């Protein structure tokens, strides 16, 4: 099994089919605590305070820029919900799972 957090996102401009439900389920096994909700990969990260939450969000923004793949974020005082989907393909792609693994690696720092 590949360490997704060490993989790099591939440019995606559409013309590629999204993962099937089975493909997404198979990829989900490589991630801890993530779920597929309404066709999006989602996870809620808890933090001790607002400072830690915002430090995570800012670091994630840098990773997202570097990978050119950006999540939808919902930020609260001590939590951040991260959702990934690939708009260009209208569903989930490998890039979503790569970035989810990078989120987990960041959270574990």
Residue ranges of model-derived segments:
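Charge-rich alpha-helical segments
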Residues: 1-109
């Amino acid at each position: 099994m590949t360490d997704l957090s060490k993989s790099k996102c591939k440019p995606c401009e559409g013309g590629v089919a999204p993962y099937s439900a089975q493909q997404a389920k198979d990829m989900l096994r490589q991630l801890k605590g993530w779920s597929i909700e309404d066709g999006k990969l989602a996870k809620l990260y808890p933090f001790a305070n607002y400072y830690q939450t915002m430090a995570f969000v800012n670091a994630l923004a840098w990773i997202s820029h570097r990978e050119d793949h950006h999540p939808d974020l919902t930020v609260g005082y001590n939590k951040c919900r991260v959702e990934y989907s690939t708009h260009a393909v209208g569903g989930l792609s490998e890039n979503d799972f790569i970035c989810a693994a990078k989120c987990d690696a960041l959270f574990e720092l």
